[in-house]
Design a protein with these regions (language model features):
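Conserved AAA+ ATPase core "coupling" helix
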Residues: 1-47
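Alpha-helix capping/termination and helix-coil
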Residues: 8, 36, 49-56, 78
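P-loop NTPase catalytic core
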Residues: 43-49, 57, 69
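C-terminal engagement/docking regions of AAA+ P-loop ATPases
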Residues: 54-135
């Protein structure tokens, strides 16, 4: 009832106040674009994505466009953590959330009640996280 009554006086969207100015958002996006990803991290991402394309429970793995989106979200995670570079934990923070809708389970997986999240967790656990090299 409250939702219906709320629409009597116009759209509730019209009463929303902005939480950030457009210029600030654009500046943040530019700063995220500048976040550095080392080749070791790119290789880590590529290995994770390749595993989505080879997994026996998946009909479709993450696409190139999905991989680009993942890299963008990884950079955003680093930015939100106050860094201008990506670390493996940034990949961990976003991998499941970004990719669960970008893969398609095959019929065997669906019949066995396997979830996209479960497959992604398995893939993530099966790929070694890069660690700093010791001299």
């Amino acid at each position: 009832i409250a939702i219906l009554k709320d629409h009597r006086s116009g759209s509730p969207v019209d009463r929303i106040s902005p939480v950030i100015q457009m210029n600030d958002l654009l500046t943040m996006q530019e700063e995220v674009d500048k976040i550095f990803i080392h080749d070791v991290i790119y290789n880590y991402i590529a290995e994770l994505i390749a595993k989505t394309r080879q997994h026996p429970m998946l009909e479709l793995g993450v696409s190139p466009r999905g991989t680009i989106a993942l890299a963008g979200m990884i950079k955003a995670a680093a930015y939100l953590a106050g860094r201008n570079y990506v670390v493996p934990n940034d990949v961990e923070k976003v991998f499941l959330a970004v990719n669960h809708h970008r893969i398609r389970l095959n019929s065997k997986a669906r019949a066995n009640h396997v979830t996209a999240e479960g497959v992604l967790e398995e893939i993530f656990a099966g790929v070694a996280k890069p660690s700093p090299k010791k001299n």
